[in-house]
């Protein structure tokens, strides 16, 4: 029997006051028993499923983001079936919304991406099903970081979000005092100006904004390197530094044209004082190479006093890097996913650790088959302390299982919730008990043509 969910506006005030969070109907019963044992326990939490609808091409996610919430007991029940695309709430965004949630799942935060409403921040009280009640007023941050801001919440008790952008200038050229003679011109550097805004998530207010020109070393700049993209701000354990991941690009100093055939440098992170957002410095890993800006999902997390950060486009396969309390990379910590998973070209697409230092990682690798939207994705269970990783074989992997746009995991104690489903195919919620590796197949997720699920919140 599949149980199909109705609108959660049917919840009574009494049920809400008791923290009981379910309202569903059964296919073979029209009379609801008020003592139904399926009523969840008082320690239940909301699990919000997000789906990205196809725009033009399968898996592009440009047709809008749909969200739908159920309680954690029903999320674990494979007889439950939900249809976010048919019954869900449309999260405001011109393209795929970039969502965040409170730690307890009771609030969804959204900043619209691109279009006329790009940069508009809204938050919603999660009330079950497709009922998301807007809280407070909108605030628009586009005047600070543009209409396509890259933002995440900071792990400070759901108080603050941070959004960033980078503006790359035209290459600086020294004309040697002869502006009409280009034969003696010398390339100097390409300036990248970053902007960072912090947002009061509780009161929908701008907290701070700063811009900086962030230099690399003189040698790196002379060779044409510059920050071309930044993302994924993360607080250190002390709460006095903000780490921002970055991607480097390069121009050919002899022509100032874009150079795609270059040596990939050690992974870099921009460090700012917090909350002032002043005094930018750059730190460099001697272990990992490539980018640290991630894509759609939070890319760095504080655990046990240090920040653990994934990198991407590493010639040796993705690493999980460690930044210690001294705000420098710990180059004695070497955790390489190629080695741990026995694959080539591992690429971390998204990940999330539990409080025990064990995490679920979404990844692809060089031998991933090419699906309808891109390379096939997988999930692995990793241990940050032991530096081990194991593919989670209990989750099915269709060739069209596409995780490049994956955003959300829910951590509930030592359990991590995730979504599975190939592009255009039905899937399920899965729950990984990180202590034991046990995997539970949960609620069915009904899909539509060309669309895919991008996580839970």
Where are these regions (language model features)?
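Bacterial Sec-dependent N-terminal signal peptides
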Residues: 1-48
């Amino acid at each position: 029997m599949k149980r199909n969910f109705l609108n959660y506006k049917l919840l009574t005030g009494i049920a809400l006051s008791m923290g009981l969070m379910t309202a569903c109907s059964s296919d073979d019963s029209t009379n609801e028993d008020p003592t139904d044992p399926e009523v969840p326990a008082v320690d239940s939490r909301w699990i919000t499923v997000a789906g990205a609808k196809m725009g033009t091409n399968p898996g592009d996610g440009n047709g809008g983001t749909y969200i739908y919430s159920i309680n954690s007991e029903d999320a674990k029940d494979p007889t439950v079936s939900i249809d976010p695309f048919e019954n869900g709430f449309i999260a405001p965004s011109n393209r795929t919304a970039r969502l965040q949630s409170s730690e307890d799942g009771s609030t969804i935060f959204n900043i619209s991406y691109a279009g006329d409403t790009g940069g508009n921040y809204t938050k919603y009280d999660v009330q079950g099903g497709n009922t998301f009640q807007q809280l407070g007023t909108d605030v628009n941050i586009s005047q600070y970081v543009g209409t396509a801001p890259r933002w995440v919440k900071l792990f400070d008790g759901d108080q603050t979000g941070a959004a960033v952008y980078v503006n790359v200038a035209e290459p600086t050229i020294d004309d040697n005092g002869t502006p009409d003679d280009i034969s003696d011109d010398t390339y100097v550097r390409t300036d990248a100006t970053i902007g960072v805004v912090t947002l009061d998530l509780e009161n929908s207010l701008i907290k701070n904004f700063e811009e900086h020109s962030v230099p690399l070393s003189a040698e790196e700049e002379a060779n044409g390197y510059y920050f071309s993209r930044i993302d994924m701000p993360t607080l250190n354990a002390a709460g006095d530094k903000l780490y921002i991941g970055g991607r480097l690009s390069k121009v050919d100093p002899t022509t100032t044209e874009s150079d795609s055939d270059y040596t990939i440098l050690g992974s870099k992170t921009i460090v700012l004082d917090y909350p002032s957002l002043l005094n930018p410095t750059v730190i460099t890993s001697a272990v990992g190479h490539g980018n640290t800006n991630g894509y759609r999902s939070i890319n760095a997390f504080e655990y046990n006093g240090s920040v653990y950060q994934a990198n991407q486009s590493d010639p040796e396969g993705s690493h999980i890097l460690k930044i210690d309390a001294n705000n420098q990379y710990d180059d004695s910590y070497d955790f390489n996913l190629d080695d741990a998973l026995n694959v080539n070209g591992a690429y971390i697409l998204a990940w999330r650790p539990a409080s025990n230092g064990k995490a679920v990682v979404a990844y692809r690798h060089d031998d991933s088959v090419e699906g309808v939207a891109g390379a096939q994705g997988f999930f692995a269970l990793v241990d940050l302390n032991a530096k081990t990783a194991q593919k989670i074989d209990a989750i099915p992997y269709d060739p069209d299982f596409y995780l490049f746009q994956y955003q959300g995991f829910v951590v509930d104690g030592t359990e991590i919730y995730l979504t599975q489903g190939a592009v255009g195919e039905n899937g399920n919620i899965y729950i990984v008990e990180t202590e034991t590796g046990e995997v539970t197949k949960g609620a069915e997720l009904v899909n539509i043509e060309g669309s895919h699920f991008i996580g839970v919140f």
